[in-house]
Each structure stands twice: as structure tokens, then as C-alpha cells.
Amino acid sequence: MAMHKGKTINVALVGNPNCGKTSLFNFASGAHEHVGNYSGVTVDAKAGTFHQNGYTFKIVDLPGTYSLSAYTPEELYVRKHLNEEQPDIVINVVDASNLERNLYLTCQLIDMDVRMVIALNMYDELERHGNKFDHNSLSRMIGTPIVPTISKTGFGIEELFNRVIKVYEEEDPVLRHIHINYGDVLEKAIYPVRHALKLNGNVSKSLYKRYLAIKLLEGDPEVESFVKIGRAHV
């Protein structure tokens, strides 16, 4: 399938605090942004525009968060944006020098089944400490493109958005759907909940049922309320 230029791609930047996400946003958008928020919350997001290869990228820099649970205003804001706005592509900005902590959020994004490209940011810090990371192998393993970037200098940003285009056009060779296996005990618990959600057509048609099942098993109060509302309309 040939790429169709002249399209607008809605992109959300998601990552931990201090991962260089906002620096990436500022470099891409030229820091020409406006601030948006949801009523009733104290956190906000910056929105800007970026052009490359005939595409227009509408970028939202969401607040830094360590997870997509329902405990902090930042977590709720990011999750609300992903669920309600449903961006075309999520750029998950990851601190290359602190992978274990950062990839927890990545796993939750995979659970949500969002279309995603990972910016392996602060790549110079990884190299400065003499470390190496086979990001291509991880990319193939999780079915998600990974691009090394240094947001403060702009290194890798052009390639990052080229991969965003490929994922948007469903032309990236790495892209595939996976789910993270949480072991026999949890998987046996997830399956019947997911199946019940699938049978209820009025419950969140646009949201991935496996993700909802996991959140229900976690006792997530917001998802529990959401599912109850859906049942009330059956």
C-alpha cells in the first residue's frame, strides 16, 4: 500500500517524568504550543503541530506518569486522553538509561492495544556509560518499532516520525499485535472476564476487552464504574 501524503496524524506523547518527553515535544513543535485541560483536573497537556514528508502531526505532550492506574491526577488525565481522544499513534518516550522502570508503562500501553512507536530517548546517556542495548531484538519481540533518540539535540527525531508514518499507514514491518502473558494463574482469570465483556456489546466497543479485564481484576474503581454504566444501558 502506497503512503498517502497530505494527511493529519494525531500523536500523543506518553512517558515517565524526566524522560525527555517535553524536550522532544519542544524540538518537534518548535515550542509553538497551546495548553489544554479537562474540567475538574489540575494537570494539563501541551499541544503543537509538526510537519514532515507532507504529513501534519498534531502532537499532544501528556503529563509524565509512571503508570495508567487510577491513583494520581496525572495517571487519570493520560488514561482519559487515550481512551476518549484515541490518538492515531502513541509515541512512548522511554529513558534509555532506566529501562526497567520505564518499560512498566510500555507494558500497560501494550495492554491497551494502542498503535505505538517507542522513542528510546537519552540514548547518549546509555552510550556514555559504556552500555549497549539490542533495541532491534526487543522491537521484534514486542511488535513495536523502537527508534533511538536524543531529544535535546534532535538526534533520531526525523526517523522517529518516519516510523510514525509507517505505523499509521500500516506499512512498518515490525508492527504486530501481541499481548503480554502474565502466567497461567492470571491468564485463567483474565479469559472469562474478557469473554463476558465481549458478549456485552454495550460495554466500551472502542476499548480493548483484555485491557478492561485486567483493570477489573486489579479492582480499578474507574473501570468498574464504567462497566456498570455500560451494563445499565443493556
What are these regions (language model features)?
Residues S39-V43, Y55-K58, A70, E74-Y77, ...:
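Helical mechanochemical/support elements of P-loop NTPase systems and associated helical scaffolds
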Residues L126-I180:
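Canonical P-loop GTPase G-domain recognition
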Residues A12, L24-F25, V43, D61, ...:
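Residue-level signature of catalytic and energy-coupling elements of molecular machines
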Residues F50-G54, Y77-I146:
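Conserved C-terminal guanine-recognition region of P-loop GTPase G domains, centered on the G4
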